[in-house]
């Protein structure tokens, strides 16, 4: 099953470069403690790496078992 990433904004990007603010915005994060779920792709991982001091990330499995 494809993996997903749960991304939570834990620190405000105010005071950081416009580049980092833009990355947070492109991840879909607008407010503190907001959580978004994204596909685990290299592009998303790169964005997270750029703002790793502002976010918390958790890997989750998508879907359940069909018994």
Swiss-Prot record:
Membrane-traversing stretches: none
PROSITE patterns the UniProt entry points to: RIBOSOMAL_L30 (PS00634)
Keywords assigned: Ribonucleoprotein, Ribosomal protein
A GO MF label: structural constituent of ribosome
Stored CDD domains: Ribosomal_L30
A Pfam family of this chain: Ribosomal_L30
One Gene Ontology term, aspect cellular component: cytosolic large ribosomal subunit
BP terms from Gene Ontology: translation
Cross-referenced InterPro entries: Ribo_uL30_ferredoxin-like_sf, Ribosomal_uL30_bac-type, Ribosomal_uL30_CS, Ribosomal_uL30_ferredoxin-like
Family to which this protein belongs: Belongs to the universal ribosomal protein uL30 family.
Subunit structure: Part of the 50S ribosomal subunit.
The name this protein goes by in its record: Large ribosomal subunit protein uL30
Gene that this sequence comes from: rpmD
């Amino acid at each position: 099953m494809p993996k997903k990433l749960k991304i939570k904004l834990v620190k405000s990007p105010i005071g950081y470069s416009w580049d980092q603010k833009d990355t947070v915005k492109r991840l879909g994060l607008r407010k503190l403690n907001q959580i978004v779920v994204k596909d685990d792709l290299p592009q998303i991982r790169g964005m997270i790496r750029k703002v790793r001091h502002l976010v918390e990330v958790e890997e989750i499995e998508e879907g359940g078992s069909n018994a």
